[in-house]
Amino acid sequence: AEVVVGFGGYVSTPAYLAARQRRIPIVVHEQNARAGLANRVGARMTPFVATTFRGTVLPHASVLGMPLRREVSQLDRAARRDEGMTAFGLDPQWPTILVTGGSLGAQRLNTSFASRAAELSAAGLQVLHVTGAGKEFEPERPDIGAPYVVVPYADRMELAYAAADLVVCRSGANTVCELTAVGLPAVYVPLPIGNGEQRFNAAVVLAAGGGLLVEDAAFTPEWITDNVVPLAGDGERLFAMGSAAASVGQRDADDALADMVHRAYASRPAPRADAVGGQGGSA
């Protein structure tokens, strides 16, 4: 290896230690707002340290953001709105709420929204609900009203984002970064486990006014009625929140991280004279 790039987790620590022993440049990228142990160790070994969020405490850190798929980072939501509507069988006349708990789904979101499907449709609020595989349900809705579309997963999330006016979701680092990159307002419901990193991940966009946060236990059907319904129907407020979200979003983190890797590569120490001589003698 000529550069070791680590993103944290238990496998990164031995890689960082081996790279330091072999004088191989190290690049550390911390995805979450609160740095994990492996990256706290790795950041002490290199000047090439990248964070996703402002406020993450690591030595030598530069805020680069989260590298995202180009389909998301370069998304023009307005230009692709009709395509997104068609892809999911939605009706462009209605405001659209995207509900997603990630690839595995989120039981709290699924059950709370399922119990309010008829109310949302009657209120003229269209829902695209990504439940997670095996967690689909048949929504109850009135004969006349906005569609409520349930899918187990979405392999073209950029089209779901293009169709959406508001997102209700967990606050994993990747989700927060995707939504801010494309300028979508969101209601964040942090996963209630771990060391609270999901709450910290949403802190920057919340401070900017680009989202709301509600704890998992408080996200009830009644909370949807009292908060999601009026918010989703308030186009002016959604526009302001979307602009605020976009103000903290970063669309070029992939290029910025690649540039840091190139700079790390260029910083490699010159081969030792004895190593060069030894290679020549064995040729």
Language-model-derived ranges and their functions:
Residues 3-22:
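An aromatic- and histidine-rich active-site surface loop
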Residues 250-283:
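C-terminal alpha-helical cap of glycosyltransferases
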Residues 169, 185-195:
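Short hydrophobic beta-strand element within catalytic cores of glycosyltransferases
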Residues 22, 162-164, 178-189, 208:
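Conserved donor-binding/catalytic loop of nucleotide-activated donor transferases
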Residues 1, 46, 164:
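An anion/phosphate-binding loop that grips the pyrophosphate of nucleotide cofactors and donors
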Residues 77-169, 176, 199-206, 214-223, ...:
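Donor-nucleotide binding loops and adjacent catalytic segments primarily
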